[in-house]
Amino acid sequence: MPTVANEQFDYVRIDTGGGVFTNRDLEARSITGTSFSVIEGTDDFLYLGDDAKFDMAVFDIDTPGSYTAPLKYEYFNGSTFKEFIPDTQEFNLDDNDDGTYSGEAYGFAGDGVEIFPVRVISDWAKTTVDEGQSAYWIRISAPNGITTGATVKNIRKRPVEAYCTTQEVFELLQLA
């Protein structure tokens, strides 16, 4: 069981098409916020990578973005990047209880979070996308259109190691 949880991503990359990556590690870690652009074109990707699994990204926005929903989220499943629906994009039953669904996905329009449900991406595997870093990667894009690309001051994560499963507590207490 890991003993240290860090809230900074190990790797943050921007791919502006064709596999040309820009390293944004330092900017994403900056506490005071050194703004950088993310997803300015429909063929751009924001890559969030870490040596350990994570289940949430926290975005501190400088300039709000305007994207045609929904954004596309992908993870590497051992052979390819596979699309998944983050928790904030899951729809909830309306209050009027008529069986219809509503919901609003996070879209870089302001500070916010996106949750990557480990239950959905259970086959998440490490891969290398740039400069030889093998990591767990989440890839975000806006293939449906962009009016204004967002600029971000920093991006933080919630590592899966930030909490224990009941099995890990059981093992820690040596009840097995």
Predicted regions and their residues:
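A short beta-strand element within beta-rich, extracytoplasmic domains
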Residues: 51-73
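Short beta-strands within extracellular/lumenal beta-sheet-rich domains
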Residues: 32-51
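Conserved short "hinge" loops at termini or chain/domain junctions
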Residues: 1-8, 16, 20, 78-82, ...
